Amino acid sequence: MSMEMELFVTPEKQRQHPSVSVEKTPVRRKLIVDDDSEIGSEKKGQSRTSGGGLRQFSVMVCQKLEAKKITTYKEVADEIISDFATIKQNAEKPLNENEYNEKNIRRRVYDALNVFMALDIIARDKKEIRWKGLPITCKKDVEEVKMDRNKVMSSVQKKAAFLKELREKVSSLESLMSRNQEMVVKTQGPAEGFTLPFILLETNPHAVVEIEISEDMQLVHLDFNSTPFSVHDDAYILKLMQEQKQEQNRVSSSSSTHHQSQHSSAHSSSSSCIASGTSGPVCWNSGSIDTR
């Protein structure tokens, strides 16, 4: 048999003929499924009965599919109908006929198959249904996902730190360029200077350092004779210069603000003395103002 189910499908874009108007109302079409069943032959609007429900049928269908691996809709539905017939015979209480009739069972099986297909648990080729397997979500998978996430987060943090370092380096270079331009304008600039990049070695002023340089100037051997030392690149030095400049600007700004505050207070006090009719120099003594 063939199964027909009525669906409302909104029409897709159609080529419009100049003399024909296309209606935008939903078009009723019929979905025909070759499964030799009578699912959907019941009247529209008939409610499904409660009871085991789709979940119960889904478990049974899943067990059948997993056991058979390759099967058909008709084979699965027939076996489940047979199983329910056996249950009905052995049941102490009579079962709901509407819930466990053949048409209702086939409809439930069909709904379960559609759900499994949407979840990629099964694959369907015409009438043949092939079992693909349930999604695997175990503790091991969760731990692997967490490890991958930690690796990604660590990589992001390293890249963020590297980006911050690059920004600081660019800012330091821009500050150095501005400083050099000002020096050239004011003092014509120094006769000699350092070129970038460079390396700075820091050690004790009294340390004895033995230096050997190859003839091609490509290899340098340094022996500090067990004296502690540090190696700094140009980026580190530029960063220190930038921090020093910012500190100087901060101190200068703070000093200027403090000076302006004192000048404003003195001017206010002097005006107060004139307004009161007194004259003479203003003297500061432990925060008090005296006039003579």
Curated annotation (Swiss-Prot):
Compartment list = Cytoplasm; Nucleus
Keyword terms, alphabetized: Activator, Cell cycle, Coiled coil, Cytoplasm, DNA-binding, Nucleus, Transcription, Transcription regulation
Instruction: Write out the residue ranges of the motif DEF box.
Output: 101-135
**InterPro entries for this protein:** E2F-DP_heterodim, E2F_WHTH_DNA-bd_dom, TF_DP_C_sf, Transc_factor_DP_C, Transcrpt_fac_DP, WH-like_DNA-bd_sf, WH_DNA-bd_sf
User: Which CDD domains is this protein grouped with?
Assistant: DP_DD
Q: Which SMART domains match?
A: DP, E2F_TDP
Q: What induces it?
A: Up-regulated by the transcription factor ERF114.
Q: Tissue specificity, please?
A: Strongly expressed in the actively dividing tissues of the shoot apical meristem, young leaf primordia, the vascular tissues of the maturing leaf primordia and axillary buds.
- Regions annotated as coiled coil: 163-184
Principal subcellular localization:
cytoplasm
The GO cellular component terms are: cytoplasm; DRM complex
Q: Give GO terms for biological process.
A: regulation of cell cycle
Write down the SUPFAM superfamilies for this protein, in alphabetical order. E2F-DP heterodimerization region (SSF144074), Winged helix' DNA-binding domain (SSF46785)
Q: Name one GO molecular function term.
A: DNA binding
Q: Where is this chain compositionally biased, Low complexity type?
A: 252-280
Q: Give the highest taxon in the source lineage.
A: Eukaryota
Q: Which family does it belong to?
A: Belongs to the E2F/DP family.
UniProt-listed PANTHER family = TRANSCRIPTION FACTOR DP, TRANSCRIPTION FACTOR-LIKE PROTEIN DPA
Domain remarks: The DIM domain (143-214) is necessary but not sufficient for heterodimerization.
What is the name listed in the Swiss-Prot or TrEMBL entry for this protein?
A: Transcription factor-like protein DPA
- Provide the organism lineage as a comma list: Eukaryota, Viridiplantae, Streptophyta, Embryophyta, Tracheophyta
Q: Which gene encodes it?
A: DPA
